[in-house]
A protein has these predicted regions:
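Radical SAM enzyme [4Fe-4S]-AdoMet core and its adjacent flexible, acidic
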Residues: 1-63, 68, 73, 77, ...
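Flexible mid-to-C-terminal extensions adjoining Fe-S/redox cofactors in radical SAM and related proteins
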Residues: 72-185
Length: 185
């Protein structure tokens, strides 16, 4: 997956935006017959998405992450909070507020934790859609699929450090109630 401009990285200008990501993947994949020369563990439709041939929405709930702090929400790249249980993650996260075109932090994201699940769902719903890619490889030239409009996304909120500081304070004082049993629910 492409590098993602997460808020804690000190060097923000070297992360790829969506257009540069698509161009880079097209250049790389064109050297390997659209990826046919290499074994990838990602789905064909996800690779096709990275090359700009699919327009996908993020599904961050498709790859949830459990940490020592609890279940990270909405995804492990944003880390905008933690909850104790999987049920609380799934039912208490306002999923509609996240994703490309919805949240400024997500504007350039094309990472597997948000889009591989979308590509897998697309492959299940449209099983023949992968066949041309399997036979000929990922298309590396021609027009790209339209991208998602960013004009109505909400501004970024920088909250990660606050969440970590709070949890570390709880751990130091022995007041942390995050347990394996609670997290597994």
């Amino acid at each position: 997956s492409p590098g993602y401009a997460y808020e804690r990285a000190p060097d923000q200008q070297h992360f790829l935006n969506r257009e540069r990501t698509k161009t880079m993947f097209r250049e790389i994949l064109s050297r390997g017959r659209g990826g046919k020369n290499w074994d990838f563990t990602n789905s064909t439709l996800f690779m096709d998405f990275l090359a700009g041939n699919q327009t996908y929405e993020c599904t961050p709930w498709s790859m949830p992450l459990l940490t020592v702090f609890g279940w990270q929400k909405p995804c492990y790249l944003l880390g905008e909070g933690y909850v104790k249980t999987f049920k609380e993650l799934m039912e208490g996260t306002e999923w509609e507020k996240y994703g490309v075109g919805k949240y400024e932090k997500c504007a350039n994201c094309m990472v597997h934790c948000g889009f591989e699940g979308t590509a897998a769902t697309d492959a299940i719903r449209h099983p023949l859609k992968s066949v041309p890619i399997l036979l000929r490889g990922v298309k590396t030239d021609g027009p790209m699929a339209p991208d998602i409009d960013l004009s109505r996304q909400r501004p970024a909120e920088f909250v990660f450090s606050r969440h970590v500081e709070k949890k570390m304070s709880e751990i130091r004082t022995g007041k942390s109630d995050t347990t394996e049993a609670a997290a597994a629910e």
